[in-house]
Amino acid sequence: MLMGKQSELNAAEFPTFLYDQGDRIGLLKRILKALGSPDQKFKIIHICGTNGKGSTAMMITAILKQMGHRVGLFTSPYIGEIYNGIQIDFKNIPSRIFEEKISVIKKLLRTAAFANVKVSEFEAQFLISMLYFAEQRVDYVVLECGLGGELDATNAVATTMYSIFTKISLDHVGILGNNITEIATTKSKIIRHHNVTITAQNQSLEALKVLENEAVSKQAVFLNADRVTITTSQQSKRSKQVHYRALLGHSEQSGTFRFDLAGTYQLENLATVLTWFFDFVKRTSFQQRLDDILAHSLAELVVPGRFETVQQKPKIILDGGHNPDGISAFVETVQKLYPNAPKLIVNGFLKDKSYEIAVQKLLTLKNSSFIITQPENQQRELSPVKLADVYKKYTNRQFPEFTSPVKAIKQAIMTASPTTVILVVGSFYLLNPIRTYLLSRSEHNGN
């Protein structure tokens, strides 16, 4: 899912969507082999799930970097330019190298062995990342699934050290499956023989059963983040101390460190990350003080688009909640942090999401008004007129509508009172233009 600058991957050469066009994984395995098997030059931590993948990936990357490793990070979706989706130690792939790798892939696809073959833009981005990470000799790659699972481009890698599953819920219904069991079954196929498989805490019983059975069939070690307990103590509005206790087999780890990521859901993601971290430390005989590593890597980590504060006056927060579970987590966080503040919510969804359920959840937020807009995705955007009709159905109110996300946020800023919290929530295709506008505006104003 490419969401930033698009010109580098011409749509005619790299179609948007080929997910259901034949044996995509078999094709990508052949391409990787022809490219010299770059995916086998480093150890892979593969992350799959419905919500929380990006945050989990960034936390793990930050920890590995703090431990002294050279770390590749592949994320989808991402915020900003196309290069943001491929990073080493949190630095984007240079545009020149990106273009070089595109040329390598194009040249290969022109050979007789791959005559008349096309790869999608997401598949191309994945292949570029593998070439780049191998060339730059990274130690580890944190690899985030796209749609996720059996037919996801990232599943073409030969082997992985870890398969990590964040919360699995209903999303991409009809593509991944029609219920939790079917979706979890599709996602479980990233598990590799003899690797370590980790599941998020509070995973549904249906998903948990599927993941555990697949891990057993692959003779993988299976770890559940339910064995990590986290409590917090607030130091300030923005900062908190995390107190954790992890039961690992017959041993126990406990400690405290600063953790500033907002969002109650980030504590669930953190439990998953801690489960991985303590297993990883055990397997690599790491000797440094663990709480120091956690504090230095996670204390000031920012995850773009995940309850991210991008402006203080007025306060503007961006969150990529775009399915029922994501919206529930967003609502819970807003109610906890801003229970009484006036709230102005800029909202837009893709038409293939369960947007009516999401609207009903958003309407539970007290002291809220709404501005309706649409994501920047011509194929999948839900028109603001249709979304406004859903709001009207449940409130009998007509909220302002804008086809342009940037015009929507401008209107929000213009009408907000000094105490209003502006919350932008919905598709990452909505957040991307708004975030770009706000950051460029901030730079222009010298903030």
Predicted ranges, named:
Residues 427:
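Active-site-proximal loop/hinge segments that shape catalytic or ion-binding/gating pockets
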Residues 1-49, 56-69, 74, 110-117:
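Short functional linear segments
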Residues 202-223, 315-316, 324, 359-421:
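C-terminal helical cap/extension that packs against the catalytic core
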Residues 74, 200-202, 214-236, 259-264, ...:
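Beta-strand->loop->alpha-helix junctions that form or flank phosphate-binding loops
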Residues 112, 136-144, 160-256, 270, ...:
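Acidic, Mg2+-coordinating active-site environments of NTP-dependent enzymes
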